[in-house]
């Protein structure tokens, strides 16, 4: 087989979510080495290492001929690579190999959830161009959320039940289990202002969150827009449906309970200050400024057959 690329770099964390990371590396390199003349395998020991390596690739200090990047890991690891690529303006395609709890954006790219199968898909995958979310000085592929979604992420980190991932726990138990905190918000989207009280605000770029599809038919990470959702108190009665695709429900048709506002530039302040979940990583608090950067990143995409 003809090598598509000259020099690929495969990034991974030791704690990637795979039970045996060394075995996992061996399983994916067979396919990746068939499309790269030279494949470097790069361990990221500490948070921030991948961003540092991206800087070295940009300045040619890592190697002079790197022309593709691969990442084996979960959403947090992928998020670090996205930040490294965007911060250093690396115009290189990225192949994502699932290796964590959720790989929401790999579903968008039609990539298999198994890392070995995903690596084999890279052989015939095509490069697609996707929008990126900028949040203050950070970047993300998939979503920005606060309120209930942050409480859920903290539950997962504590080893508790993943509320959005375990849909049977949503609905009747959501108020007793999570006791959603109400907060006041002031939101500006493309110069229009909104204010009120809510338990959750979500701005989405990709159509999957927490492993399930957002039931909104026209949500696309290639349309130059973000979709912001404001959930009011009454909307928790339909939380059973929110992160679960159901024929009987479509967010396009919902007016009561969930307010949907598409837009490109967003400013958000809250009272009190709220933690912010960015692709599963909680690293910021409000106030935040959000914008979509169209056609910002190249990702290997499997053709949807």
From Swiss-Prot:
SUPFAM superfamilies: NAD kinase/diacylglycerol kinase-like. GO terms for molecular function: ATP binding; ATP-dependent diacylglycerol kinase activity; metal ion binding. Its cofactor is Mg(2+). Pfam families: DAGK_cat, YegS_C. Mg(2+) binds at residues 220, 223, 225. Keywords: ATP-binding, Kinase, Lipid biosynthesis, Lipid metabolism, Magnesium, Metal-binding, Nucleotide-binding, Phospholipid biosynthesis, Phospholipid metabolism, Transferase. The active site is at residue 281. One of its GO terms (cellular component) is plasma membrane. Binds 1 Mg(2+) ion per subunit. This ion appears to have a structural role and is required for catalytic activity. GO terms for biological process: phospholipid biosynthetic process. Belongs to the diacylglycerol/lipid kinase family. May catalyze the ATP-dependent phosphorylation of lipids other than diacylglycerol (DAG). This is Putative lipid kinase SAB0675c. It comes from Staphylococcus aureus (strain bovine RF122 / ET3-1).
